[in-house]
Each structure stands twice: as C-alpha cells, then as structure tokens.
Amino acid sequence: MNKAMLRSIMTLHGDTNKDLADYLGISEQSLCNKINENGTEFKQGEIKLIKIRYNLTADQVDLIFFAE
C-alpha cells in the first residue's frame, strides 16, 4: 500500500484521519491500522468509498491500495 499517496490525497481534500474514518464508518484507530498495514486491510467497500470521496481513477486506486 502507498500510504504516502493516500495521505497526500487526504491532505489535498482537507481531510484528517477522523474525517475519513467517520466517512467510512470505522474508528480512527481502525483507519490508522489499515493505513499502516498493522494487521488489517481495507475492505473492498471501503476502497470503493475512498475512490468516490476523492474522485480517484482506477490507476490511482491501484497505486494506492495494490502497490507493493
């Protein structure tokens, strides 16, 4: 996962971890764990919501969530 790219997109949209966590309906701690790949991953539905919130292209989604 490319957490730097996700964080930069969040910043461009003025979102904090709390803003995105609230939008996804998860706790801020859960979001941090997912971003830091600390034992949990983003679910497909969460990725879809992030794509919609930030108007991401399919390539951007691939770069953020599926990059090694």
What is the predicted function of each stretch?
Residues 26-41:
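Recognition helix of helix-turn-helix/homeodomain-like DNA-binding domains
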Residues 61-68:
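Short amphipathic recognition helices of helix-turn-helix/homeodomain-type DNA-binding modules
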Residues 1-16, 23:
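A short, Lys/Arg-rich alpha-helix, primarily the initiator
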Residues 7, 32-33, 62:
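Key DNA-contacting residues within the recognition helix of helix-turn-helix
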Residues 13-18, 43-46:
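Short, charged amphipathic recognition helices of the HTH superfamily
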Residues 17, 28-29, 58:
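The DNA-contacting recognition helix of HTH DNA-binding domains
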Residues 45-60:
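DNA major-groove recognition helix of helix-turn-helix/homeodomain DNA-binding modules
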Residues 19-21, 50:
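Short alpha-helical "recognition helix" segments of helix-turn-helix
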